[in-house]
């Protein structure tokens, strides 16, 4: 099918902050052929291209003078199954949570801790998405991406993706690789990760006696729904700042003034701090400037109460960053990509 272009399209429905900016050109693509076609046409016109999925990791601060390519590919399949280990593949445009629930319905374990994360399958490896003690890299079996410089398809192994904390080769090389489909190694046996956050407590509260991947998923969904606002009701991009990793010396200096600092020692001797705790201690929780604000229940989440612009959201984020650095000597890094 020939790819269709539209002009001056509002991106409000395509980003979870609900920021109303316009794309000069916009196209939805549903398969590899349409992706190549759209990229080729953009190259002929000398147009830059911005690829988006669920729009849950974007902060749009201006109109986009480019072709915005919306990945709308769908499909999921089992590639191999030896009775215990199952490799499944999903197209980049598959909604992430729906894909996770599909794997659980098949009796496959591994993705349950990553339930209810907004976005699409293709975006998950970009950030090495993680939650409740599990990251994409822990269940990753490979992906296929298009090299936008050469037009060639390439398969990536776990090592080649160079995953880090909310980081990957693809995030460090924006615009180079377009992820088309991702593969995951799942199991029939449950290997439960229950020690991060209140997961174990929530399972107990829900009266779970038989531990299953679906029960863990349900518990995590209930926790997330309590803590995180639904983007359909209140514009947001989930956690807005990464948890900073700092030196042990800095943590001790902070602890001298704030004995309750939330800190997680890392294997390399550094320490990960809870960004939400820092922001809350600094008094930003529930803060609002016009329609840009910090969520009243979760200080790690910036929210758009309706009419905030991307520039206003960014200005608020910059104020928070400056204040946290002044108070604690800690630099907060934004998670969403800024355009």
Curated annotation (Swiss-Prot):
Coiled-coil parts of chain: none
KW Ligase (keyword) present: no
A Pfam short name: FAD_binding_4
Required co-factors: FAD
EC class of the enzyme, as a word: oxidoreductase
Pathway assigned to this chain's UniProt record: Cell wall biogenesis; peptidoglycan biosynthesis
Top-level taxon: Bacteria
Listed InterPro entries: FAD-bd_PCMH, FAD-bd_PCMH-like_sf, FAD-bd_PCMH_sub1, FAD-bd_PCMH_sub2, MurB, MurB_C, MurB_C_sf, Oxid_FAD_bind_N
Cellular component annotations (GO), alphabetically ordered: cytosol
Enzyme Commission (EC) number: 1.3.1.98
Keyword Kinase: no
Stored NCBIfam families: murB, PRK00046.1, PRK13903.1
Family per record: Belongs to the MurB family.
Protein name: UDP-N-acetylenolpyruvoylglucosamine reductase
Species this protein is from: Pseudomonas putida (strain ATCC 47054 / DSM 6125 / CFBP 8728 / NCIMB 11950 / KT2440)
Lineage: Bacteria, Pseudomonadati, Pseudomonadota, Gammaproteobacteria, Pseudomonadales
